[in-house]
UniProtKB/Swiss-Prot annotation:
Record Pfam families: RNA_pol_Rpb6
PANTHER family: DNA-DIRECTED RNA POLYMERASE SUBUNIT OMEGA
Protein name from the UniProt record: DNA-directed RNA polymerase subunit omega
Keyword Lipid metabolism: no
Similarity comment: family membership: Belongs to the RNA polymerase subunit omega family.
Function field: Promotes RNA polymerase assembly. Latches the N- and C-terminal regions of the beta' subunit thereby facilitating its interaction with the beta and alpha subunits.
Organism field: Francisella philomiragia subsp. philomiragia (strain ATCC 25017 / CCUG 19701 / FSC 153 / O#319-036)
Gene Ontology biological-process entries: DNA-templated transcription
Keyword line: DNA-directed RNA polymerase, Nucleotidyltransferase, Transcription, Transferase
Amino acid sequence: MARVTVEDCLDKVETRFDLVVLASMRANNILKKGYSESADNEKKEKATVVALREIAESEITPDQILRNEIEG
């Protein structure tokens, strides 16, 4: 997928507002794990773009994001 859009993600999440919260949680989780935009991917994507792409491509579900947030 060349570009991630909100519409790509809305099939997986009920509302845009939920999408914002979930993508933010996932991006923070990615950064906590030591993600580096320069070292970890050749496209130099930001953590928020990676989070949205994972949601759009069903690599991670909203339930998994919430579970990861609770477990810390």
